[in-house]
């Protein structure tokens, strides 16, 4: 291989409106202590009424492109992961975001892998770059999860937040600046564990019209148990496959769904506190945006530097899951 795919830049964006746990006490049977004890979440950000996922994503994308020392016209492909797209069926959020960036006549499409979306993005971008088809791929995890939440459901609405993270994937000749490995999986037999109901109208030929709210539904206990079991196995697998140990990893950046899930994986693999990046307490679960937002924050805080090896993992609706070993190829 003449070159490898490389994560050249990372940027994140969080909306300005900060919603603390106490805000939910006004309309739900809950408390700040109850939420934090069970999830580790203290606050989250919500986008404004007029903002969409693409609006959040374009802010992160512009900064990622700038940090890669490129212009929007240098981008060959745009891929967005989201469970809260701007439009229900079409156009894709990637197309909308491309237009807002001023990118024309370049391919753009969405990926639907829920909270595992960013790992899927890495897999797709790595394949396209290393095949030689595209040189610079913009990947964006952008979510306005607040648009799909039922604020009468204590089990879901307290968990999620809005935000976006973006990366430019380019080329490198150096293995230790590359996306070393990505593994993704899914099992649709558990699709009813985490989903949003069908919202498209039935055909006029249906004898009985069925409608449902477009709100996120989750079997919390079942998802928690499967997530811990699956992620432990998946992370062990990717480390063993690449002959690496936890101590070889500079930063462990998991999907920020629930502090208890993160701690279970961290303790099992004996990661030190300084290796683990945590943002769940301040942003909640931002689905496909959570990993790039955590990466972006680590970069901005000076914790992530060129050549650092990151271990990423995620689990989400589908059910989907995946992990990645990524050297930071930026500066």
UniProtKB/Swiss-Prot annotation:
Pathway: Lipid metabolism; fatty acid biosynthesis. GO terms for molecular function: 3-oxoacyl-[acyl-carrier-protein] synthase activity; beta-ketoacyl-acyl-carrier-protein synthase III activity. Keywords: Acyltransferase, Cytoplasm, Fatty acid biosynthesis, Fatty acid metabolism, Lipid biosynthesis, Lipid metabolism, Multifunctional enzyme, Transferase. Residues 256-260 are annotated as: ACP-binding. One of its GO terms (cellular component) is cytoplasm. The active site is at 115, 255, 285. Belongs to the thiolase-like superfamily. FabH family. PANTHER family: 3-OXOACYL-[ACYL-CARRIER-PROTEIN] SYNTHASE 3 (PTHR34069), BETA-KETOACYL-[ACYL-CARRIER-PROTEIN] SYNTHASE III (PTHR34069:SF2). HAMAP family: FabH. Catalyzes the condensation reaction of fatty acid synthesis by the addition to an acyl acceptor of two carbons from malonyl-ACP. Catalyzes the first condensation reaction which initiates fatty acid synthesis and may therefore play a role in governing the total rate of fatty acid production. Possesses both acetoacetyl-ACP synthase and acetyl transacylase activities. Its substrate specificity determines the biosynthesis of branched-chain and/or straight-chain of fatty acids. This is Beta-ketoacyl-[acyl-carrier-protein] synthase III. The gene is fabH.
């Amino acid at each position: 291989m003449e070159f490898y795919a490389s994560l050249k830049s990372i940027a994140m964006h969080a909306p300005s409106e900060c919603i603390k746990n106490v805000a939910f006490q006004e309309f739900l049977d809950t408390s700040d202590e109850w939420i934090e004890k069970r999830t580790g979440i203290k606050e989250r950000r919500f986008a404004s009424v007029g903002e969409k996922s693409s609006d959040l994503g374009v802010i992160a994308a512009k900064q990622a492109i700038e940090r890669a020392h490129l212009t929007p016209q240098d981008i060959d492909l745009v891929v967005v992961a989201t469970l809260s797209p701007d439009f229900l069926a079409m156009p894709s959020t990637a197309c909308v975001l491309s237009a807002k960036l001023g990118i024309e006549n370049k391919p753009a499409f969405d990926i639907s892998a829920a909270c595992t979306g960013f790992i899927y993005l890495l897999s797709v971008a790595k394949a396209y770059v290393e095949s030689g088809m595209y040189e610079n791929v913009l990947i964006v995890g952008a979510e306005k999860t607040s648009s799909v939440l039922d604020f009468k459901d204590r089990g879901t609405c307290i968990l999620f937040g809005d935000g976006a993270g973006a990366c430019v994937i380019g080329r490198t000749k150096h293995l230790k600046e590359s996306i070393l490995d990505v593994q993704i999986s899914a099992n649709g037999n558990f699709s009813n564990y985490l989903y949003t109901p069908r919202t498209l109208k039935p055909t006029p030929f249906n004898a009985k019209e069925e409608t449902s709210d477009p709100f996120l539904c989750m079997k919390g206990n079942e998802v928690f148990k499967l997530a811990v079991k699956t992620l432990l196995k998946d992370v062990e697998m990717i480390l063993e496959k690449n002959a690496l140990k936890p101590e070889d990893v500079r930063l462990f950046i998991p999907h920020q769904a629930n502090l208890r899930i993160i701690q279970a994986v961290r303790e099992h693999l004996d990661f030190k506190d300084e290796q683990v990046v945590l943002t769940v307490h301040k942003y909640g679960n931002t689905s496909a945006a959570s990993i790039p937002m955590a990466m972006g924050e680590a970069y901005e805080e000076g914790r992530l530097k060129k050549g650092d090896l990151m271990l990423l993992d995620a689990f989400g609706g589908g059910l989907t899951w995946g992990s990645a070993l990524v050297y930071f190829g930026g500066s």
